[in-house]
Every structure is written in structure tokens, then in C-alpha cells.
């Protein structure tokens, strides 16, 4: 509905503010889909619980390390903060000894943020989008006819059909 309202405002020449979407998003594919479905109006994705969890896990790991009581689910990945947090060495290289005083909750949050960043970059590269503002609704297709009808995103069996037929019938100059 927000996208439809923004479309109507734009069609009337009204100013459309940058919009943000919230609602249980937790992974990079969620972020990509929100930005694509809301393009060009949605510029941000709000994440609440998804960001709190790695912070709380990091805080718990810090407590367990101090108590020398790491659960097996954590100790299978390492026995120190350097081994458990994949981005710890990066922070240590950037901030030196100061990184040793960083709360592990913050390091957990940073590590999760880096995972989101790299994953989003990979999805964007795969879809040939090298800037956030180039992501668009044309980067998506609906898996069901009902989803296509509701969203206005082309159904998977129809998406890029004309382009494919043109290549088949007329050939392709660049291959």
C-alpha cells in the first residue's frame, strides 16, 4: 500500500519522502527484496530483533568466556573471542589495543552487520546492481500468480518472456 500511495503522489507531481520499511526483516535477501519492491521510494530497511540477537549472543559469549563455561554450540567454533568472532581480527587491525576493550555484544553486532553487507553486495552483483539506487522492481519476479496480482511484480513464467523471445527469434548481436 505504501508503494501504491507513493506512486500516486509521484504521478500528481507531489514530493514523495524517502520511505523505510520495517517488519521482521533479518537477512540480506530480505533487504534486497524490500528495496526492489519499494523502488524508487524505499531507501532504508528497519531491523530490530535481527540486530539485537547477535548483540545478546555476543554478550552471553563474553560472560561464558569469563566463566570458562562455553556451551558446545559455541566452543565448536573456538575457545577465544579471536576464534569465535570472525571479524575480531579486522577490528583489532583497525583499532589496535582498543579493540580488546570492546564489549563482545558490540563485536557480535558488528560481525552480523558485516555478514549483511557482504551478502547484500553479492546479491547486488549477481543482479548487476552496483549501487543501491539501481535496485528496482524489475530485479524481482513473483513465484505465484496470486503474488504477481497483488504486488504488480511479473509472474515467473512471464518475467522477461518478451526479451527471451526476441533473442530467440531475432538473434543476439553480442554473443
Regions found by a protein language model. Give the residues of each.
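C-terminal extensions of enzymes
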Residues: 53, 80-175
Amino acid at each position: 500500500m505504501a508503494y501504491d500511495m507513493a506512486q500516486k503522489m509521484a504521478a500528481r507531481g507531489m514530493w514523495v519522502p524517502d520511505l523505510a520499511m520495517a517488519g521482521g526483516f533479518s537477512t540480506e535477501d530480505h533487504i534486497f527484496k524490500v528495496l526492489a519492491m519499494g523502488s524508487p521510494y524505499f531507501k532504508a530497511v528497519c531491523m530490530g530483533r535481527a540486530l539485537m540477537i547477535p548483540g545478546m549472543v555476543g554478550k552471553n559469549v563474553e560472560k561464558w568466556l569469563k566463566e570458562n563455561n562455553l556451551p558446545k554450540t559455541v566452543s565448536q567454533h573456538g575457545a577465544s573471542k579471536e576464534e569465535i568472532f570472525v571479524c575480531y581480527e579486522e577490528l583489532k587491525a583497525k583499532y589496535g589495543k582498543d579493540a580488546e576493550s570492546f564489549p563482545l555484544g558490540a563485536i557480535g553486532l558488528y560481525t552480523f552487520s558485516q555478514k549483511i553487507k557482504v551478502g547484500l553486495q553479492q546479491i547486488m552483483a549477481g543482479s548487476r546492481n552496483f549501487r543501491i539506487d539501481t535496485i528496482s522492481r524489475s530485479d524481482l519476479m513473483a513465484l505465484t500468480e496470486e503474488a504477481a496480482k497483488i504486488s504488480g511484480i511479473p509472474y515467473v513464467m512471464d518475467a522477461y518472456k518478451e526479451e527471451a523471445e526476441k533473442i530467440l527469434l531475432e538473434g543476439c548481436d553480442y554473443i
